[in-house]
Amino acid sequence: PCSSDNEEAVMEYARRLADLQEQVKDQIFIVMRVYTAKPRTNGDGYKGLMHQPDTHAAPSFVDGLKAVRHLHYRVITETGLTTADELLYPASLPYVEDLISYHAIGARSVEDQEHRFVSSGISAPTGMKNPTSGNLSVMFNAIYAAQHPQNFLFNAQAVETSGNPLAHAILRGGLDASGKNIPNYHYEDLLA
């Protein structure tokens, strides 16, 4: 789910997905999307489990990180599935990287140098979306940066990475110059 904040609903979906995985295990390996932080274009609105695990209480990142770990752990241990999450906050990576087997860099984050560089040090598949504009060159530059060695400051430390050969594209739709939605599945739209 895009907003994995209702634990029991997520677990019900996970059990169904695990049943499907069993049926197709010879053809495909399913990784469950468990997105726990929601990017917001203007910063308003509910920001997900990471921010506010209890919607009736004040936001709490400490409680949010505990809830995120708990949810990923439950999906993994109770269903046997592995999980994917959007890496909205690179600083949260050390708290969840032992549980998450696939990371996504979203459309609003893909142009950010810190996301690109942190991705270059992740030892798991990391998908880069094209930005909200749909611009593919931005996504390709992000993939290039993530696949190559980088050195940068992260969490108050100098970091050197060797590159992530598993960085790849996640295609989403976009907008053309006139603001019209364009799909991501026609060859001619991808080349435009």
Regions found by a protein language model. Give the residues of each.
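Active-site-facing alpha/beta catalytic cores
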Residues: 5-190
